[in-house]
Amino acid sequence: VPSVRARRLARWLRDFRRRAGLSQDTVAARLGWSQGKIGHLETGRNKASPHDVALMLDIYGVVTPEREMVLELAERAEQRGWWTDYTDVLSSPYVALEDEASMIGDWAPQVVPGLLQTPDYARELLTAGMLDNLDDREIERRLQARMARQTIITRTENPPELHVILDESVLTRQIGGPEIQRDQMHRLVRETRRPNITVQVLSASAGAHIGLDGAFILLRFAEEADPDVAYTEGFHGVVYLENPHLVTRCNVAFERLRELALSPEESAALIETAAEE
């Protein structure tokens, strides 16, 4: 899955070519590239180096200020994100998208989402959830990566809006024992006070609802031209949904869950009660 910057750059390259009235075959022939390379650059499947972008802009007749803007975007798309230090334990495509998101919607019917987990709570989940036999060092490595992810919600520059909907069972499911669970609830209480974080609880009394099919995450971006992405993971691995119809269904589902859930104020009170039990 291309990063947001890569998708944005790909869209600009595609639009410039079309504005120039050129086919992919024509551009490929002029540059001595394959048509497949042009196609991959225009979908973000392959990274476009600033050098390649400059060559394409020459052919398309793109001049400043658009030229400078797109070349700067190409350079930014090549920059290493913090997650590149954890590629051995993290899904780089997901964290790259998460890092660029302006809004993260997380339906969490089983456990507290990773962005809000305490280290001890996260360690218990990492240990219990591994089908492979990982040693302590590998588990700690994954834990470090998860804690590093959390810095996006506290950063001073453009932190995303995080909207979490928890199933009520998450508040009482013992992960690692009473003390770890209690500390996690206290952490949730603190996080609900951040202006960019909203936590709602879906009461057990809600009965049958659209979220019973499983957890999912919605990622929305600041620029309207950047389409939303939905994400889910499990034993099957990870699944990214970019098809507009499917993403719309996820958006509708999240909105229905939001309407069914307790208000943020009622939810905070319920979490505080769970923290004291």
Give a label for each model feature.
Residues 1-15, 19, 25-29, 43, ...:
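Interdomain hinge/linker segments and adjacent boundary elements that couple functional modules
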